[in-house]
Amino acid sequence: MSSRYDRAVTIFSPDGRLLQVEYAQEAVRKGSTAVGVRGGNCVVLGVEKKSVAKLQEDRTVRKICVLDHVVMAFAGLTDARILINRAQVECQSHRLNVEDPVTLEYITRYIAQLKQKYTQSNGRRPFGISCLIGGFDADGSPYLFQTEPSGIFYEYKANATGCSAKTVREFFEKQYREEEVSTERGAVKLAIRALLEVAQSGQHNLEVAIMENGKPLKMLDRKVILEYLDIIEKEKEEELEKKKQKK
């Protein structure tokens, strides 16, 4: 009897749970770590890519994409392709009909509603991904949202999804400072430090994107990321030196 609750997305279990939705959330927890930081004048998204084969083109492994003037990172299954296509069409349709770009909350709500529909229909399964969505509204204000497989969404100053998301959230709660992320440099440093806390493949498979108001998405190349890594390493050494001096 219990298997019916496992298999059907439209049937609640006796304790009031939708098990298929919970399984989708478990798929997210097994995905690559993705982090987002809302800075004073930018939104930074970073992901840890899984190790690629030596002969595989690195550019084909992407966890960060652009939806019109909005940037999205995701963790979980390749279900993201469907959401990306639907969201891009919605962004273009809105721009043609209203002659204005979508707001961040509008496109986030659209993605969340699409996810929620898939938790109420037979013959479908929930989307096994969690999305971090960042960008700017027309007034120049930066925003960072996250959507879950169940269809809920929240706004954050900084957050993470994927495997080890809990560890990264705890890191953000301790390390996030408004004054430090007020600059692009500070926001990027915090995002990279968060990824390094849980990176399973070290520092070699990090992907970082910066969205600034009115500018195209900027993907940091390997050289720039290495420069940030050197700065972070030096700061760690300085902190250790200060602690030794206090003792």
Swiss-Prot record:
Pfam families: Proteasome, Proteasome_A_N. GO terms for biological process: ubiquitin-dependent protein catabolic process. It is found in: Cytoplasm; Nucleus. One of its GO terms (cellular component) is proteasome core complex, alpha-subunit complex. SMART domains: Proteasome_A_N (SM00948). It comes from the Eukaryota. Keywords: Cytoplasm, Nucleus, Proteasome. The keyword DNA-binding does not apply. CDD domains: proteasome_alpha_type_7 (cd03755). The keyword Disulfide bond does not apply. InterPro entries: Ntn_hydrolases_N (IPR029055), Proteasome_alpha (IPR050115), Proteasome_alpha-type (IPR023332), Proteasome_asu_N (IPR000426), Proteasome_sua/b (IPR001353). Belongs to the peptidase T1A family. The proteasome is a multicatalytic proteinase complex which is characterized by its ability to cleave peptides with Arg, Phe, Tyr, Leu, and Glu adjacent to the leaving group at neutral or slightly basic pH. The proteasome has an ATP-dependent proteolytic activity. The 26S proteasome consists of a 20S proteasome core and two 19S regulatory subunits. The 20S proteasome core is composed of 28 subunits that are arranged in four stacked rings, resulting in a barrel-shaped structure. The two end rings are each formed by seven alpha subunits, and the two central rings are each formed by seven beta subunits. The catalytic chamber with the active sites is on the inside of the barrel. This is Proteasome subunit alpha type-7-1.
